[in-house]
Structure formats: structure tokens, C-alpha cells
């Protein structure tokens, strides 16, 4: 607690001083929430960039089962994916969506896999008119983060689903060392 004598001494010491006028400019910063929303929107736009409707990849289709393996990956990974050795941690249901909405959802799924460090995801295409079922693999093979895809085994959706492996930063390190 401040003594009466100390307070009087302080007041005499600062007698005649004036309050400093604030003349510095403080820049306005964008709130963190808006920055993260903007960054996520940009990432989603960047991801959608990879999904061209005109691209026709050479996909392996044996017995109506669609398969894809990136060139730098061990072929045994594709066999494991087809057997169901990988358990999907994220599921995306595209039933009833338009092509544009499905493309946006695919971009969001890949971003979510990267953010949550999910290696395997399942995409439910359904049977329907088969337009999405045929287009989804064509879009996925264009994305650099997609390692492999395979028609899902029965326990993960069978003919109506696709399992996809998404590259994670640490998985690349494990392969290199």
C-alpha cells in the first residue's frame, strides 16, 4: 500500500508534466478467424484446380474395378488397398450431388485428410447413372497428393465406393529414409 508521504512526494516530482499525445499509427490486422477462413478458401480453390473434366487418364479397369497407382509407389500398396488392408478414417458420401458440388467436396476431403493426417478415405459414389462413379477416379488421379485408389472391398462399400490413399508429409519421409 502506498503511504501518504510517498504519494505526496510522487505528485511533487511529476508536477508540470503533460500527458503524451499518441501519434503512432497502429495498423489494423485481419482477425485470425478471417485469415484462417481465407487460407482455407484459397487451399480449396487450389485443390479444385487439379480436377479437370477434359483429362482422360489411363486407368486400370479389371472386371469393372477401377484402380490407380502413382508411378513412384510400390505396387504392393495397390494390392493391399484392394484387399481392404487399409481402414478408411474419413468417409465422403456423394449421393445426389451435382458434378460441380462433388468436385468441391472432393477438394474439401483431400484438404481434410491433409489437415487431420488421414491416410485412407472412402468415397461413396453410389450406383445411380454412373456419371460420378466414372468421373471421380478421373479427377482424383490428377491430384498430386493422391497415391492410389481402388474400388472398395465389400466391407467398405463394394462397387458403390472408392478407397483413396492421400500422401502425408511424414509418409514421404518414411519412404525416402
UniProtKB/Swiss-Prot annotation:
<dbReference type="GO" id="GO:0004521">
    <property type="term" value="F:RNA endonuclease activity"/>
</dbReference>
<dbReference type="InterPro" id="IPR002625">
    <property type="entry name" value="Smr_dom"/>
</dbReference>
<dbReference type="GO" id="GO:0019843">
    <property type="term" value="F:rRNA binding"/>
</dbReference>
<keyword id="KW-0699">rRNA-binding</keyword>
<comment type="subunit">
    <text>Associates with collided ribosomes, but not with correctly translating polysomes.</text>
</comment>
<dbReference type="InterPro" id="IPR022990">
    <property type="entry name" value="SmrB-like"/>
</dbReference>
<keyword id="KW-0255">Endonuclease</keyword>
<feature type="domain" description="Smr">
    <location>
        <begin position="92"/>
        <end position="167"/>
    </location>
</feature>
<keyword id="KW-0694">RNA-binding</keyword>
<dbReference type="InterPro" id="IPR036063">
    <property type="entry name" value="Smr_dom_sf"/>
</dbReference>
<protein>
    <recommendedName>
        <fullName>Ribosome rescue factor SmrB</fullName>
        <ecNumber>3.1.-.-</ecNumber>
    </recommendedName>
</protein>
<keyword id="KW-0540">Nuclease</keyword>
<dbReference type="GO" id="GO:0072344">
    <property type="term" value="P:rescue of stalled ribosome"/>
</dbReference>
<dbReference type="Pfam" id="PF01713">
    <property type="entry name" value="Smr"/>
</dbReference>
<keyword id="KW-0378">Hydrolase</keyword>
<comment type="similarity">
    <text>Belongs to the SmrB family.</text>
</comment>
<comment type="function">
    <text>Acts as a ribosome collision sensor. Detects stalled/collided disomes (pairs of ribosomes where the leading ribosome is stalled and a second ribosome has collided with it) and endonucleolytically cleaves mRNA at the 5' boundary of the stalled ribosome. Stalled/collided disomes form a new interface (primarily via the 30S subunits) that binds SmrB. Cleaved mRNA becomes available for tmRNA ligation, leading to ribosomal subunit dissociation and rescue of stalled ribosomes.</text>
</comment>
